[in-house]
């Protein structure tokens, strides 16, 4: 059996909603977003997504849901996870 694996490049956009903190002027500090995202990015970057637990069928929709579920506890105010495969093709996920 011949198996040809191919790679994809995705743009992941995370949207956070909430009140603006009067002391900082932020809804969320982008460094906090980066820290929450970094372990997931490291886990997903240049890997075979089918081998990632929970991503055995790594459609864009299921990838967005997987990211949401992985981030919701560490990123308060998470409102939307977007996965873009191209400039005009992508999905958005929220709960």
Go through each PLM region and give its residues.
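Charge-rich, low-complexity N-terminal segments
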Residues: 3-95
